[in-house]
């Protein structure tokens, strides 16, 4: 897939919203105290831990950008699911999503479902989808309570999960990890039985890791 890696545009952050789980916005000292109090009240405090491999993936139903609701349980009936949580202003999300889209174009829809889960409103999410040419389905977490982000214990975005058909999380990836993305692509290849496709082009300089 020969698309150019999109560049982060700091002017495209969109409107300000409550900080969701996984948001690492820089705050003033006063802002940090307010944010931490809010975080404890809404998301269970700083001891939240992202669900790891071997854990059961919480079921969820969320509205999709296309308008129809998405059910994890229903999707798993057809095969494994890749769920990628993101925030539009996160530069690491902006780096990761074009590669996730390559996985989707190579293997998605053939016994593997890939969805993005946005922590932003529909307008800002639509702008992100357009700017970074995201072609897989994108869902909207409730930006007032972030119930699904909370259920998965998000500490950073992007957070990407490979959920096996039995509902068990087999890959739990936080931030950008080349190794994890290659593992997810390998699982998608194995599940679909498709011909192997190039994930990273030889001319691309791919980071091994970037913190979310």
Language model: regions and residue ranges:
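Non-globular targeting/processing and membrane-anchoring segments
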Residues: 22-24, 31-77, 131, 153-156, ...
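Short, glycine-anchored, charge-dense loop/turn motifs used at functional sites
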Residues: 67, 161-170, 174-175
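Short active-site neighborhood of thiol/selenol oxidoreductases, capturing the structured segment around
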Residues: 72-94
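Structural microenvironment flanking redox-active thiols in thiol-disulfide oxidoreductases
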Residues: 94-132, 145-148
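Short, internal strand/loop/helix patches
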Residues: 129-166
């Amino acid at each position: 897939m020969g698309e150019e890696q999109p560049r982060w545009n700091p002017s495209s952050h969109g409107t300000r919203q409550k900080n969701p789980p996984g948001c690492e916005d820089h705050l003033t000292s006063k802002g940090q105290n307010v944010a931490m109090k809010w975080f404890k009240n809404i998301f269970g405090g700083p001891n939240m831990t992202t669900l790891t491999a071997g854990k059961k993936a919480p079921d969820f139903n969320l509205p999709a950008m296309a308008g129809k609701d998405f059910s994890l349980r229903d999707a798993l009936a057809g095969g494994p699911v890749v769920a990628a949580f993101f925030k539009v202003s996160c530069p690491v999300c902006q780096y990761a999503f074009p590669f996730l889209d390559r996985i989707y174009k190579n293997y998605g829809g053939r016994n593997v479902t890939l969805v993005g889960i946005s922590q932003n409103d529909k307008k800002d999410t639509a702008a992100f989808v357009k700017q970074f040419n995201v072609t897989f389905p994108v869902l909207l977490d409730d930006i007032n309570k972030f119930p699904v982000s909370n259920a998965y214990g998000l500490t950073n975005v992007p957070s990407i999960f490979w959920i096996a058909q039995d509902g068990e999380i087999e890959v739990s990836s936080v931030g950008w990890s080349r190794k994890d993305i290659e593992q997810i692509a390998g699982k998608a290849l194995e599940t679909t039985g498709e011909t192997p496709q190039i994930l990273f082009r030889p001319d691309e300089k791919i980071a091994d890791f970037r913190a979310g």
